[in-house]
Amino acid sequence: MSMSAFRIRCVAVAALFVATAATVAFADPPPAAQIKPRQDKLRDMGGALKAITDEIKKGRIDWDNAVIPNAQTVKDRSVYILNWFPKGSGPEAHVKTYALPAIWQKFDDFTKQGKQLQADAAKLQQVANAKDEAGLKAQVQTIGKTCKACHDPYRSPDYEKDNEE
C-alpha cells in the first residue's frame, strides 16, 4: 500500500470516528433522563400561572414585573410541551413520574390538549402585553380549564398528595 493510500484511509477512519462521536454527543438523552427536566419545566409553568393569579387576587396588578414575564414563561414553556413526553419516559422508565400511561396510549388526544395549551398560552401573553385586566382574568380561567382537561386523564392523582402545601 502506498503512503498516499494509507493517509487517505487514516483520514477516512478519523472522519468516521469524529462523525460517530458527534452523533453520540448530540443524541437525545435516554427517556428516563428527560423526566426530571420535564417536571421542572412544568413546575415553572405552574408557578408562573400561580404568580399571575396572585397578582389578580391582590387587586393591583404589576404588569411589567409580574404578569408579562410570567405570561412569557407560560408561552415559552408551552411551545415545547409536546416534546417533553417521548416514548419510554412514563412509568416504564422506573423513575418517579406523575405521567400516566394514558399519555402514550392516547397520544393523539394528548397532542390535541397540548396544542390547545399552546394556543391559550399565546392568548395569555397577548392579553398580558395589552395590559387588559378583564382579558387576563378570562384567559387565566380558560388556561386553568385547559390544564385541568389534560391533568385529569393524564396526570397521576398522586401528584396532588405529594405536592400539598
List where the protein language model places each region.
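Boundary of Sec targeting at the N-terminus
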Residues: F26-D28
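N-terminal signal peptide c-region/cleavage motif recognized by signal peptidases
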Residues: A19-V24
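Short, linear, compositionally biased motifs with a strong N-terminal bias
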Residues: A15-F17
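Sequence context surrounding c-type heme c attachment/ligation sites in exported
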Residues: A32-D64, I68, Q72-T73, R77-E165
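Bacterial N-terminal signal peptides that target proteins for export
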Residues: S2-V13
